[in-house]
A protein has these predicted regions:
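Domain-scale, conserved, charged regions that form catalytic cores
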Residues: 2-347, 353-360, 371-383
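Charged helix-capping and loop-helix junction motifs
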Residues: 421-425, 447-457, 483
Length: 541
């Protein structure tokens, strides 16, 4: 039973994640250290490298034992909740929830079928989306403005992303009635797929997570502010102290019916008793929490780990996350601990980013003219150095990643075709925003493997945060998302000293024309980060 040895069970579930990626990290970091030693001809300098306390080369990406793992969880800031979703060799889905205030909760969620209908449905939606994008050559962009019939206008000066992607040059011409009908059909199909994805996400939560869905959320209360409530609840003797604490922490997020379902799930998880808890008892517990608890006002985060074969699913858009939408992904908890170690024991999160120390690469292939036009207007608000329409050299990329605090790429894919192995050879200081189709998609290679992704190279290079796309979207849509994210980061500049990147992403997602098909494709891996607002905008001095 998971409740009998919670720390041991949690240790094994968490330790099982991303073994191949962690081995790659060990190999690359050792290679960096070896290269650093060989490049220093001075014997004393070589010995200094060997004796260095730099955690990067010596980090082994594993936990020594259960006690080591427990000590790391207990050192987490209270605003951080770590949730590990794992898939065992029998295709059973498990959730492991860890927080510094209580012992872990391990829940057996569901057994996935060999050809699971949910995964099949997601593949169907993405295949239809890809097909609609590829067929959309020379389709004008839809405007937010309405015509006299209440329908969206079609913009003549917008062109379709795949025409640019395939390097096809078509003569400029005014849209004909046939073109406008094609555009109407195209955007009708995109909106239909967006609605399908919305329904799918709700079904995903219901069928795979069920009553356990609230466990994805961080605490809504601070325990030190609610000690009297905990004491009163302990006197009832219905639940264990960890379970009572968890029920208190999540009460303010969910309806009473959802809370009762969660209570029963947790009780079944910690006892083999088939006796139901009296409804009056549950109502009394709920009343004590409702009347006596104090809800916290601070922003909290969920660090979410999912296996590679499930990484293409839009977990961040599950309905339950509407209550606390700040979600950061990780390949494994080891990567979070590695990034924190490299930041010399981060005392507070989010990590602050100086927006004035930025660099961008825009349309290096030179074939995304409309994207270049749109984004040039956007970056023109800032005093950022960058490259437009030209391929950066490896030295330029290396300097951008090491000396800047924000790196923005807008082009095809992740940009890896241009700088190859440069990222893995660098110690990356810059939060990296990769706005290209499938830029941080993890390509599944089967059970027991961690897949392939440019994402891994950035995280191994100690990139604090990587933002990118999980699947294909049109250039116009993702350009709009990038613009909305920038606008959200600037909002309330007179009243807020910092702005969460994750908060800006959430709001940009909601303001998308296609909040699921486009908005849900953008996710963030790594540490929570925030921009210093007074440093982000160009100063007129």
């Amino acid at each position: 039973m998971p409740h009998e040895y919670p720390w041991t069970m949690a240790f094994y579930h968490v330790e099982s994640m991303a073994p191949s990626m962690r081995q790659l990290a060990r190999t690359l970091l050792l290679r960096k250290k070896t290269h650093k030693i060989k490049s220093n001809k001075d014997i004393n300098q070589q010995q200094e490298v060997l004796d260095s306390n730099d955690p990067a080369p010596t980090h082994n990406f594993t936990f020594r034992d259960t006690d080591h793992f427990k000590s790391l969880i207990e050192r987490l800031p209270p605003e951080i909740t770590f949730v590990n979703i794992s898939l065992d060799e029998e295709n059973v889905l498990w959730m492991t929830r860890c927080h510094s205030s209580i012992e872990p909760v391990i829940i057996r969620l569901s057994k996935l079928e060999r050809d699971d209908p949910m995964l099949a449905k997601m593949s169907e939606i993405l295949e239809s989306s890809d097909l609609s994008v590829r067929k959309s050559m020379n389709i004008p962009q839809e405007s937010d403005e309405k015509n006299e019939n209440g329908e969206s206008k079609i913009l003549d000066n917008e062109i379709e992303r795949d025409k640019e992607h395939l390097h096809i040059k078509l003569p400029e011409k005014k849209s004909t009635e046939q073109d406008l009908q094609k555009a109407k059909a195209f955007w009708g199909e995109r909106k239909r797929l967006d609605e399908q994805l919305k329904v799918f996400i709700g079904d995903l939560q219901h069928k795979w997570l069920g009553a356990a869905a609230p466990l994805l959320l961080p605490p809504a209360v601070d325990l030190q502010d609610n000690e009297r409530v905990v004491t009163r609840l302990m006197g009832l003797g219905v639940f264990s102290i960890p379970t009572l604490t968890l029920l208190l922490q999540l009460y303010h997020y969910i309806s009473e019916n959802e809370w009762i379902r969660l209570s029963k799930l947790l009780r079944d998880n910690e006892t083999q008793s088939n006796r139901d808890i009296a409804h009056t008892t549950m109502s009394r517990i709920a009343q004590i929490i409702k009347q006596g608890s104090i809800k916290s006002s601070r922003k909290c985060y969920t660090l979410l780990v999912v296996p590679p074969q499930l990484s293409h699913l839009p977990w961040e858009c599950l309905p339950i996350f509407e209550q606390s939408p700040y979600v950061m992904r990780l390949p494994s908890f080891h990567i979070f601990e590695y990034l924190c170690t490299l930041e010399q024991e981060i005392k507070e999160l989010p990590k602050m980013v100086n927006g004035r120390k930025s660099f961008y690469v825009l349309n290096p292939s030179g074939d995304l003219s409309n994207t270049q036009k749109r984004i040039t207007d956007f970056v023109g608000q800032f005093n950022w150095p960058g490259l437009v329409g030209e391929v950066p050299t490896r030295d330029q990329i290396r300097l951008a990643l090491t000396e800047s605090e924000l790196f923005l790429y807008i082009g095809h894919g992740s940009g890896g075709r241009y700088w190859r192995s440069t990222v893995r050879e660098t110690y990356c200081n810059a939060v990296s925003i990769l706005m290209g189709c499938s830029s941080i998609k993890i390509y599944d290679e089967g059970p027991g493997f961690d897949g392939r992704s440019s994402l891994y190279e950035y995280l191994i290079a100690r990139c604090p945060c990587v933002v990118g796309c999980l699947w294909m979207v049109t250039d116009g849509e993702i350009d709009s998302f990038q613009h909305n994210t920038g606008q959200e980061t600037q909002n309330n500049i007179k009243t807020e000293s910092i702005k969460l990147f994750t908060e800006a992403i959430v709001k940009a997602r909601l303001s998308c024309k296609l909040p699921y098909l486009t908005g849900a494709s953008v996710v963030a891996y790594g540490l929570p980060v925030a921009a210093a607002m007074d440093a982000l905008l160009k100063l007129n001095v």
